[in-house]
Amino acid sequence: SVVADTVNVTDSPNCKSRLNSLLVASEIRRSGLDVILQLTGRDRNQIALESVLLGALSVGVNKVLCLSGDQPDKNGPVVVNEFTSNGLIKLCKVISRGTLTDGTKIKNPLPIFPGAADDLYDQLSKPESLSKLATKIEQGANFVQTQYCFEFDIIKEYSDKLSDEGSSNDCKVLVGMGPLKSAKQGDWMRKNLWGINISDDILYQLETSDNPIETGEKICKELIEKIIHLPCVDGVHLMGPNCEIGSARIISNFR
């Protein structure tokens, strides 16, 4: 049975070739589950991006997380980068209004709901980050998904900052987190993935646990219980590579 409200389909993360994200999103949508299609400007020019968005609408996928995309190493594949994440949000809005960028009219246009990514730690340490998020919201972002965060104090400070600025009034904010399976996994993530800060205390809980998988799920569940009533926190974006069953168990606690 369906547990999550929607699921994200990633777009060649870490700049590695993966199964076409729109194909996967289409199959999931056909099963009856709602989908958020992640779309990067890294690999596609304007024509290719418009084609993906039209294709998404044709199969009932109308939520798009607009990303710049992980960039390759110096000797990696050639990138396009014609569109930034901001540019992708604007493109979604143009298509929602019924035209392509060259003015071509779209028959029976449908709305696209673009989303933006955010990093809580950047928001709290770099004054310019809030204005960048505000710009994305002004350009039409309907929702925000943040990077992983496992610290209540950081999430509360982020929530208070958004509330004070009023910058998220017109969109939904989903805080990112996920069940960690081991201290080793958590340590690797904080060293290698953008925007992630996992405290030594959490790693210690996992390392000393007789059942680290259960402990990782418990950490998530308890954090969700603390943040669901914060202002400007509208939901949770659970990320659990190879932890889909654990993520489902966490969600089930709140149904």
Predicted regions and their residues:
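Structural motif
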Residues: V2, V59, Q139, L230-P231
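Hydrophobic or amphipathic alpha-helical targeting/insertion segments
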Residues: L54-C66
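Short, acidic/polar
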Residues: S1, S21, Q46-L53, L124-T135, ...
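Active-site-adjacent beta->alpha loops and helix N-cap segments on the catalytic face
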Residues: C15-E27, N45-V52, D70-T104, S125-E128, ...
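Aromatic-anchored, glycine/proline-accented short structural segments
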Residues: S129-K181
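Active-site pocket-lining/capping segments in soluble small-molecule metabolic enzymes
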Residues: N81-P109, A117-D122, E165-L223, N242, ...
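Conserved, mostly hydrophobic/aromatic
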Residues: V7, A56, K136, G140, ...
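Catalytic beta/alpha-barrel core
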Residues: T6-S17, L39-T40, L65-C66, N142-E151, ...
